[in-house]
Amino acid sequence: ALANCSDVVSGTFACFNGDIVSSLEITPVLDLHKKNGGIGTLALWEVEDPTRFGIVGLDDNSRITQFKEKPTKEEVFSNLINAGSYVLEDDIFDIMPRGKHSIEREIFPGLAADGQLNGKQFSGYFIDAGTPESWSEGVQACIRNKRFSSGEVCGGSWFSNPMAKVIDGARIVG
């Protein structure tokens, strides 16, 4: 899906997997990215069982040295996982193959081997909301942590349910 944005994205940008609910503040990830350079900086989270996720090896300079998507128990070398939130350079589009591909399986391992990925661990909460049960857990976390607020919907082409909320400071114009 990210490759479909190559015509409208330029420079440094943030990318977030749509099924993640977390307490991540992106500024420290961006700061590390600016400091270390490279093509990408990934937010990282520590888990007990990393076999459902992409795992990373991280050196003392916050460079990702290895990346393995959904390892078997025998392949696990770390409990730090890719938390589905990235700061990337538009150079990423130059190395993405056209058509269907997986950034986690086909792009990140090579970038890690080339020293082009950084990692920033965060604390708070992280929920992979890809199942109905975990989606409900994510909604509850947002309510508990007061992550909902209201912004503004302007113009005539957007449909907004009266129960929908737009975050403070955001404007939807269309």
Language-model region placement:
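A generic fold-level signal
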Residues: V8, P50-T51, D59, S78-L80, ...
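Short, flexible, basic/aromatic active-site loop/helix in glycosyltransferases
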Residues: L58-V76
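A residue-level structural signature of the nucleotidyltransferase/glycosyltransferase Rossmann-like core
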Residues: F13, V21, I55, L80, ...
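Left-handed beta-helix
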Residues: P28, K35-N36, N61-R63, D90-G174
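Short, well-ordered turn and helix-capping elements at secondary-structure junctions
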Residues: L44, K68-T72, D168
